[in-house]
Structure formats: structure tokens, C-alpha cells
Amino acid sequence: MGLLTILKKMKQKERELRLLMLGLDNAGKTTILKKFNGEDIDTISPTLGFNIKTLEHRGFKLNIWDVGGQKSLRSYWRNYFESTDGLIWVVDSADRQRMQDCQRELQSLLVEERLAGATLLIFANKQDLPGALSSNAIREVLELDSIRSHHWCIQGCSAVTGENLLPGIDWLLDDISSRIFTAD
């Protein structure tokens, strides 16, 4: 994020943030977004392209971009990087088969220049499912402790029950606002 972007955001009376939600297909990105927004989650289908939701939370205006995670769509992810304040990486904790794919895709995002400085929240989703990897196990598999380029946090959650979605989002907002916004 450039200096002009930071200065512009400091002057804004309305605290507006751009959050980019990415992850492999079927990780639960759209379900998290809908649950957070209080919408029905019974009829969710794979995202072919992207969804944008604008939500108000804790005095912030959040523009959340939920981008499809199918392999055929991942090359388009870079089209959404510009002006991103926070990156939400969603992991299907029950999908042990694709953890290496998940790790590889996350690592490729972290070297993107246009995401430099963006705060990273990793949602270890589907904690309600039997056999789901714990947050600590995912932390190891994804090699999160090696991340030095971004502030990050991993939060175990369930998009279906809504458990731990708010603490994750609140951490993200606290971290972003401590970097971007000045005290009033």
C-alpha cells in the first residue's frame, strides 16, 4: 500500500476498508461472508467469479470481496489485489488431501507486491466437522510461523455455526486500524 493511500485513508471520516477473501474452492468463503452478514446459508453454490458485500461493523465500512477458489479461477486472483487492506485466507480444515495445495497458493499470495502490507487472517474453517485439523496443526502444515512479510493470525472457526467468526474479523480490524488510521 502506497503512502498516498495511507494519507487518503487517514483523512477519511468514514473508515472504509477493502478485505479480500481467498482460499481453495469449497473452503467456505461465501458461507463465512453470508453468515457474518446474517444471511441464509442453506442455498450456497460454488462462486464462479466473485461476490462483493459492503457491511458496517464497529464503525467501519467493510467492502469484502469473495473470489471463487476453483483452480481455473486462481490465475484471476491478482486482478483483485489492488488497494487491499486485509487478506482473509480460508482453509477447509477437514480437507487434509489439499493442505499442500493450500500452503502453496497462500505462499504465492504472500510474495505479491500489491498485497504487501495487507494484514492476513487465516480462518481454519469447518472446525465443527469430525476429523478437522486443529488450528495448531494447520499452522504447522501451512508453515505460518515462517511468515515475516505480513501481520497474521489464525482463527479456528465454523462458518455453519458462526463460531469464532467475529473474533477473527475483530482482530483483523484492530490490526489494520492500528496501521492505517490515526486517533481522532
From Swiss-Prot:
InterPro entries: Arl2 (IPR045873), ARL2/3 (IPR044612), P-loop_NTPase (IPR027417), Small_GTP-bd (IPR005225), Small_GTPase_ARF/SAR (IPR006689)
SMART domains tied to this protein: ARF, RAB, SAR
Xref: Gene3D superfamilies: P-loop containing nucleotide triphosphate hydrolases
Subunit structure: Found in a complex with ARL2, ARL2BP and SLC25A6. Found in a complex with at least ARL2, PPP2CB, PPP2R1A, PPP2R2A, PPP2R5E and TBCD. Found in a complex with ARL2, ARL2BP and SLC25A4. The GTP-bound form interacts with PDE6D. Interacts with ELMOD2. The GTP-bound form interacts with ARL2BP. Interacts, preferentially in its GDP-bound state, with TBCD. Interacts with UNC119.
NCBIfam families from the UniProt entry: small_GTP
UniProt family annotation: Belongs to the small GTPase superfamily. Arf family.
Protein name (record): ADP-ribosylation factor-like protein 2
